[in-house]
């Protein structure tokens, strides 16, 4: 093993979860600007492509039958139904990035994060909550870290720190903010 390998943090999946309106996407944009090597999976969906979306960039657009085939084959790490459409995270590209040593940041809702925990118990779950709100105790216990989104810069900096962390998560939950 080289010195470079020893200095590099072990690749890990970090799930940034929060309720609708918590600002997950804003935080992810700020994190990507600070930590360009982090990989953010492109979600798969059965909804039609909208202009100016490009297949494989903003979303991977799948026919409903293809989505079902991938679910049956275990190729979706997690998935959900939103209205008449489905969306999910393709597992093979995510696994390939982790196996290659790349840090992965996956923004999801709380339900999606819990589904990831079942399939990948070593994933680091980070709960993002809006200012002035406290997470439900039952929800908070599933997460290693809780961040209050009162300042996108601060939250992004803390998340970048977690992404670069080589140590395992503490057994206790941290509430910041």
Residues covered by each model-derived region:
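Extreme N-terminal, non-catalytic leader segments
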Residues: 1-13
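Conserved glycine(s) of the Walker
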Residues: 18, 23
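NTP-dependent small-molecule kinase module
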Residues: 2-4, 138-177
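ATP-dependent small-molecule kinase phosphotransfer cores
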Residues: 43-104, 111
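A conserved segment at the C-terminal end of the G1
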Residues: 25-36
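Short glycine-/polar-rich loops that comprise or flank the Walker A/P-loop
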Residues: 36-38, 120-124, 140-144
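Hydrophobic packing residues within well-ordered alpha-helices of enzyme cores
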Residues: 31, 116, 135-136, 159
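Conserved phosphate-donor/acceptor-positioning beta-strand/loop module used by diverse small-molecule
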Residues: 104-110, 118-136, 148
